[in-house]
Structure formats: C-alpha cells, structure tokens
A protein has these predicted regions:
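Short His-Asn-centered micro-motif
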Residues: 55-57
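N-terminal "first-domain core" detector
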Residues: 10, 44-45
Length: 178
C-alpha cells in the first residue's frame, strides 16, 4: 500500500497505523432503515490528505449514505487502534483504477481493471482517533498488574483525536489522483 507523506506528525501516525494494520472495517448507514452495516475493506492507498482509497463494487454502495462513514482498524497484538470518520466519494476514473490495481484485488474483480462494476471508494477524513501502546502483550500485562497493585492509572500508550483543516476540503480531485 502506498502511503503519502502527511502534513502533521499526528496525521502521519494515523496513516502509518492504518498501513501497518491493513484490513479495516467500514461502517455505513442504510438510507432506508437507518441501520449500520459494516464490512471488511483493504486500503490501497492513503493519499496526502489522509484519504483512504479502496476498491469496491459500485452496486455494493446502493442505498447507503456516503456522507458519513466510519473506518475502524485494530491490531490487538500491538494495542494499536484507529477510528476514522469521513465522507466517501465514488471514483469511476479508469486511470485511477489502473494506477491502484493490484493482483490482490483479482479474487473480487475477475475481469481486472475492466470489471464493469469496479470503482474506487475514497474516504476523506473529517476526524480520527488513535490509540497506540506500541508495546508487547507482556509489557502491557506487566504495566496493568503494576497499575492494579499501585492503585494508579495505567498510563500506557498514546490516545489522540485529530480533525482536518478546512484547506483540505478545497483541493481538486484531479490533483489528488494524478
């Protein structure tokens, strides 16, 4: 997966965590019932605006609200977690699909880049949170035991909230996909 350089340390941390974790869950709201539905998604790229790009079949998006989606990535072995709230847009551009194509997508899109329903789903970050302990299970278990014995908070890892800047919302799609 290609990860572009981000404009701040926190945004870069989020991009790196998502890249390291790999597959995440995307949650969208059903327009008719209001129910939330989730499915696993494998990111293809994280662009310079911390937008996450995926392949999907266009028909799988019918009936879902794309103006508010959630992406959740979890790596319990390393106590790393990311939650991204954003807006999704569908990109039908063949050049973008070709640029992002990977043989890993072949099981879902048998016809390759020419698959008639293949689109890129680009989720633009509005806000995100991450938790990262960046330590082994043994260290975390020791820290928890110490915390219980000492009666003090565990204080293990980092939790941050990040929101995008307004300037991100005005860049052209052409520049992002070039």
């Amino acid at each position: 997966m290609k990860v572009h350089t981000q404009e701040s340390e926190d945004l870069q941390k989020i991009a790196d965590l998502v890249a390291d974790i790999g597959v995440g869950m995307m949650t969208m709201q059903d327009n008719a019932t209001g129910e939330l539905h989730s499915r696993p998604m494998m990111p293809l790229e994280i662009d310079d605006e911390l937008a996450v790009l995926f392949f999907t079949h266009e028909s799988s998006l019918y009936g879902y609200a794309l103006d508010r989606v959630n992406l959740a990535f979890a790596d319990p072995d390393h106590a790393s977690y990311v939650s991204i709230v954003g807006r999704a847009e569908v990109i039908k551009d063949v050049a973008a699909i070709t640029r992002l194509w990977t043989p890993m997508a072949k099981p879902w899109f048998q016809e390759g880049v020419g698959d008639p329903g293949l689109v890129v789903l680009r989720v633009k970050l509005d806000s995100a949170e991450y938790w990262d302990a960046n330590s082994s299970r043994v260290i975390r278990a020791f820290a928890m035991a110490t915390s219980v014995l000492a009666g003090e908070p565990i204080g293990l890892g980092v939790h941050k909230r990040v929101k995008t800047t307004p300037s991100w919302r005005h860049r052209s799609l052409t520049n992002r996909l070039a």
